[in-house]
């Protein structure tokens, strides 16, 4: 049984409210859970003290028992300095793709050819 520390959505339509729960990975998102360890209200200001309410001791206990936090919960726990979340790095994300590079190379070659013809 693999355990996850994840968000279970509550609240009304367009007014989300999340419980931070420990649940079996196979259980439904908003369904059965083992223990509720906190709450998260995304509508509150980022610096509001009650935006994230979490029992840090329970979170540490569950992490020690092998529960895996989801990406969003890992971000929240990192913000509370409970765990250290590794930052993701994709240096190729902003680079042009293959066809765009080919077009740029063709345009550069055409510009160079035009410049050499104008100089001659």
Curated annotation (Swiss-Prot):
Belongs to the bacterial ribosomal protein bS16 family. Keywords: Ribonucleoprotein, Ribosomal protein. The keyword Hydrolase does not apply. GO terms for molecular function: structural constituent of ribosome. Signal peptide: none annotated. The keyword Ribonucleoprotein applies. This is Small ribosomal subunit protein bS16. It comes from Beijerinckia indica subsp. indica (strain ATCC 9039 / DSM 1715 / NCIMB 8712). The lineage of its organism: Bacteria, Pseudomonadati, Pseudomonadota, Alphaproteobacteria, Hyphomicrobiales. The gene is rpsP. One of its GO terms (cellular component) is cytoplasm. Pfam families: Ribosomal_S16. GO terms for biological process: translation.
